[in-house]
Swiss-Prot record:
The gene is hemA. It comes from Pseudomonas syringae pv. tomato (strain ATCC BAA-871 / DC3000). Keywords: NADP, Oxidoreductase, Porphyrin biosynthesis. GO terms for molecular function: glutamyl-tRNA reductase activity; NADP binding. Its EC number is 1.2.1.70. CDD domains: NAD_bind_Glutamyl_tRNA_reduct. One of its GO terms (biological process) is protoporphyrinogen IX biosynthetic process from glutamate. This is Glutamyl-tRNA reductase. The lineage of its organism: Bacteria, Pseudomonadati, Pseudomonadota, Gammaproteobacteria, Pseudomonadales. During catalysis, the active site Cys acts as a nucleophile attacking the alpha-carbonyl group of tRNA-bound glutamate with the formation of a thioester intermediate between enzyme and glutamate, and the concomitant release of tRNA(Glu). The thioester intermediate is finally reduced by direct hydride transfer from NADPH, to form the product GSA. Possesses an unusual extended V-shaped dimeric structure with each monomer consisting of three distinct domains arranged along a curved 'spinal' alpha-helix. The N-terminal catalytic domain specifically recognizes the glutamate moiety of the substrate. The second domain is the NADPH-binding domain, and the third C-terminal domain is responsible for dimerization. Catalyzes the NADPH-dependent reduction of glutamyl-tRNA(Glu) to glutamate 1-semialdehyde (GSA). Belongs to the glutamyl-tRNA reductase family. It catalyses: (S)-4-amino-5-oxopentanoate + tRNA(Glu) + NADP(+) = L-glutamyl-tRNA(Glu) + NADPH + H(+). PROSITE patterns: GLUTR. NADP(+) binds at residues 187-192.
Length: 425
């Protein structure tokens, strides 16, 4: 039994590398099954967000190199390039890392709550793929419990900040009066929902939600009194959009330099503020070269995020302690499980010996033997049989000079100093 947590994140890899290592939702089930088959991992799950791609694996004898090689091959990267950005945590460290991630302690935005939902989705997909078994399943449940305790017992979730909040905060710095601004939101997922909520609360004049399916866009738009359109309507909507924030799961850019140039001409070069939260990127980087466009990527949000996180630093210390306790408790309980099979076999052996001696005693009673003599013989016979195998092994270990094993036996049988009975003089 061993755990591995392996991957890249916003601290170790650029957005260019992260978008190349990201998994689409459609890829996950097949990738998990392929991972387990080709690397002989016993259990596996994949967490892939705009800021990280991580593999969680339970195995018996598996090196991190084989997993890295699979990941590099799957995404058509060189192993050297991936290794330069990757990190690996094993066993206790892997458990602690998962709990830190789920609690928001390893996020770009410290304490952001969305990561827990993303972790739960990773678990659900792994179950669908059939790559989660009892051990990784227990680890996920312990991870969710630890994250919940962090939320409940610390102030890590107060003063809400997120990538979405950071994007809106940046928009506030550029537009002094958001109530006169119009916003175009591309996508309809969790991050865009948060962006829409923040903009709505700030009283933005008009919000448009563009999505691949009109149905999903309409559901989100209805929640905030916005307008729903298809992705094909984006060029027309750009003309009236002061703020553009995009976060989809598209593998190709949705917004190109040409479309933005055309919109700027019709806007008479009135500036457009854009934030591309997606990985891979939704907006072509060349758009940022235009004079009247302020284009920011996820990586550009670091400074804004840092300013909004000062109030959470104290809470993070308490959260780290809770995570450490949770990780230690999980590993302790997991190691206890390793003794279950041995204890079960020992109990079965003891019960067999008991039944043999009990049957012998019952026969003696049926033949008219004295009840007290039968009980004494039953107790003596059971004691001798239970001690026979351990006694033989202890003598053998002593003859071999195995002092360590003898000390362990003394601890196993709770034989402290002075515990040996002495015959009365």
């Amino acid at each position: 039994m061993a755990f591995l947590a392996l991957g890249i994140n916003h601290k170790t890899a650029s957005v260019d590398v992260r978008e190349r290592v990201a998994f689409t939702p459609e890829q996950l089930v097949d990738a998990l099954q392929q991972l387990c088959h080709l690397t002989e991992s016993r259990e596996a799950a994949i967490l892939s967000t705009c800021n990280r791609s991580e593999l969680y694996i339970e195995h018996e004898h598996l090196g991190a190199d084989s997993i890295l090689a699979w990941l590099a091959n799957y995404h058509h990267l060189s192993l050297e390039e991936l290794r330069a950005s990757a990190y690996v945590h094993e066993d206790d460290a892997a458990v602690r890392h998962m709990m830190r991630v789920a609690s928001g302690l390893d996020s770009l935005v410290l304490g952001e709550p969305q990561i827990l939902g993303q972790m739960k989705s990773a678990y659900a997909v792994a179950r669908e793929a059939g790559t989660v078994g009892p051990l990784l399943g227990r680890l996920f449940q312990a991870t969710f419990s630890a994250a919940k305790q962090v939320r409940t017992d610390t102030a890590i979730g107060e003063n809400p900040v997120s990538v979405a909040f950071a994007a809106v905060s940046l928009a506030k710095q550029i537009f002094s009066d958001l109530q006169r601004s119009q916003a175009l939101l591309i996508g309809a997922g969790e991050t865009i929902t948060l962006v829409a909520r923040h903009l709505h609360d700030l009283g933005v004049k008009r919000i448009v939600v563009a999505n691949r399916t009109l149905e999903r866009a309409s559901i989100l738009a209805a929640e905030f009194g916005a307008h729903a359109v298809l992705l094909s309507d984006i060029p027309a909507e750009l003309v009236n959009s002061d703020i553009v924030i995009s976060s989809t799961a598209s593998q190709l850019p949705i917004l190109g330099k040409g479309a933005v140039e055309s919109a700027l001409k019709l806007r008479k070069h009135k500036p457009i503020f854009m934030v591309d939260i997606a990985v891979p990127r939704d907006i072509e980087p060349e758009v940022g070269e235009l004079d009247d466009v302020y284009l920011y990527s996820v990586d550009d949000l670091h400074e804004v995020v840092a300013e909004n996180l000062k109030s959470r630093q104290g809470a993070a210390l308490a959260a780290e302690q809770l995570v450490s306790v949770g990780a230690e408790d999980f590993m302790s309980r997991l190691r206890e499980l390793a003794a279950v099979d041995v204890l079960r076999a020992y109990r079965q052996q003891s019960e067999r010996l008991r039944d043999e001696e009990l049957s012998k005693a019952q026969r003696m009673l049926a033949n008219g033997s004295n009840a007290e003599d039968v009980l004494i013989q039953l107790a003596r016979g059971l004691t001798n049989k239970l001690l026979h195998a351990p006694s033989v092994q202890l003598k053998k270990l002593s003859a071999e000079g195995r002092v360590d094993a003898l000390a362990m036996a003394q601890e196993l049988f709770a034989l402290g100093e002075g515990s040996t009975d002495k015959t009365p003089q």
